[in-house]
A protein has these predicted regions:
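Membrane-embedded helix-loop-helix hairpins and adjacent transmembrane boundary segments
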Residues: 1-487
Length: 487
């Protein structure tokens, strides 16, 4: 399908304008004066900015394109995104404020930093850092795929898609290197305003354009495609998969390096409590986006590629101006999360791999420069990986969720369980990762989400083995444990 020049020009103008704002956000040299300033903004962000930043971080182009694609191809299974985010925000209310207080006092910028201090274990820190970096690469690639798909629909016949994608991500790498977290934080304001305005406009107008009203669209779904509105009771993605995927994804959400980067920018713990209450409002958009997938199923020709369901639906529904606004929204929902993900991955590598194992005596100024420079390496690796293995991205990201949730017991349990031991935690993490990869490799999930098997094995190993090492742990203390457990 031929692109639309007007839509392409509007998309390009908005994206380049936002990138420019990203550079302007870092004009003050203090934004890159230290790792803490560059990666978490000196922990000075208030409730609204954290809400917008975490929203920009978690609700990506993959969220919107992936949800409509899943709804288009598999129906109501796409609704699993709703309970999983609610689980994530509900649980986070109880542990993120405590984690933030520890990170603030001890100047921690990654979960691996916390694990090292809590358990006095560089090895556990290394494990968490490696898992965090490796799992983020395909996630960054999915953002690349999001903007590539957007440009394919908007710009076919006018531009070289791959060249423009590479240029776009290099620009993001540059403004991230220059501005740190302040770049995506301030550009997230624009992105989130566009998401709310454009997505709400789409979900209101598309049913009217094609069916006359929302009620008529629902009637047509019920009459012509009732299977879209039900979840299978059995099979590889039935109700057991839906429930376990929601639980695992919810627990994993704030284990991602980019998610916790947004969390650590908060100026106090109360900001995080407020965000746990108000972030679920984003689910209003998600629910409606799923119905756009249903609309695409009814409107687009049979045999259409589910991957392009939302983009093609926009293309057949509107003229160039609205297309451009919609495409730019999706493009920004790719680029801004990519920036935050690159910060998270760079931070893990520089602090928990380079500083702890390669150059322990590195000076703070050099460490800051290495952390910032790693942005180019991370985004470069993501670009290469995405071009070499384009069909593996979604499955690897889903595996990434199952991998990241294995960190949950090491981080969250240890905030409340004083006698949790280093040895049992490490063994549990390794067992969880091993079981997850074994289930994923064999494909024998028995209708359960892969990560659930791994997390179950992880927790069982931790609980069973912890008593073997607990005697030494009872007599042990360190500054983080003193803060957590001394009344």
């Amino acid at each position: 399908m031929q692109g639309n020049l007007t839509a392409l020009l509007i998309t390009s103008f908005i994206v380049l304008s936002v990138v420019l704002i990203g550079f302007i956000a870092g004009r003050n040299k203090s934004s890159r004066s230290s790792v803490e300033e560059w990666s978490v903004g000196g922990r000075r962000f208030g409730p609204l900015l954290v809400w917008l930043l975490v929203g920009a971080d978690l609700y990506t182009a993959y969220t919107f394109l992936g949800l409509t694609s899943t709804a288009f191809a598999a129906g109501s299974i796409a609704f699993f995104a709703i309970p999983y985010t609610i689980i994530a925000f509900f649980v986070s209310y109880f542990y993120l404020p405590k984690l933030w207080e520890v990170s603030k006092k001890h100047k921690l910028t990654t979960l691996a930093d916390y694990a090292k201090g809590r358990f006095d274990s560089k090895f556990l820190s290394l494990l968490i850092a490696i898992v965090g970096v490796l799992m983020l690469i395909p996630y960054i690639d999915l953002q690349l795929a999001g903007i590539q798909d957007t440009l394919t629909v908007a710009g076919t016949g006018y531009i070289n898609i791959k060249v423009v994608v590479i240029i776009s991500f290099l620009l993001v790498a540059l403004y991230t290197f220059f501005s740190g977290i302040k770049g995506p934080a301030y550009t997230a304001v624009i992105k989130d305003i566009l998401v709310w305005v454009i997505m709400l406009f789409l979900v209101v107008s598309i049913p009217i354009i094609h069916f006359g009203s929302w009620g008529s669209m629902i009637d047509k779904i019920v009459t012509d495609s009732p299977e879209l509105l039900t979840i299978p009771t059995t099979g590889p993605k039935g109700i057991p998969w839906f429930l376990t995927a929601s639980l695992v994804s919810g627990l994993a959400l704030f284990m991602w390096a980019h998610a916790v980067t947004g969390v650590f920018t908060a100026k106090n713990a109360d900001v995080l409590r407020k965000n746990a209450i108000y972030l679920p409002f984003y689910n209003i958009v998600l629910i409606l986006v799923v119905f756009l997938g249903f609309a695409a199923y009814l409107v687009l020709p049979e045999g259409s590629d589910p991957r392009f369901a939302l983009l093609n639906l926009i293309q057949v529904s509107y003229g160039g101006v609205v297309q451009g606004l919609a495409y730019s929204t999706i493009a920004l929902a790719s680029l801004i999360p990519c920036s935050i993900m690159a910060i998270g991955a760079s931070n893990l590598f520089a602090n928990n791999i380079y500083r702890d194992f390669i150059n322990p005596n590195v000076k703070p100024e050099k460490l800051t420069m290495i952390t910032r420079s790693m942005v180019f390496v991370v985004i470069g690796l993501a670009l290469i990986f995405g071009m070499l293995f384009p069909t593996a991205l979604v499955s690897l990201q889903l595996l990434g969720v199952s991998g990241m949730v294995q960190i949950f017991p090491a981080i969250v349990f240890s905030l409340f369980w004083r006698n949790q031991t280093r040895e049992a935690t490490i063994i549990g993490l390794l067992v969880g990762l091993g079981v997850t990869f074994a289930v994923y490799s064999t494909g024998k999930t028995f209708g359960i989400y892969e990560g659930f098997w791994g997390l179950s094995a992880n927790v069982i190993a931790l609980i069973v083995l912890n008593p073997l090492f607990v005697k030494k742990a009872k007599d042990k203390t360190n500054p983080i444990m003193d803060q957590l457990f001394t009344k």
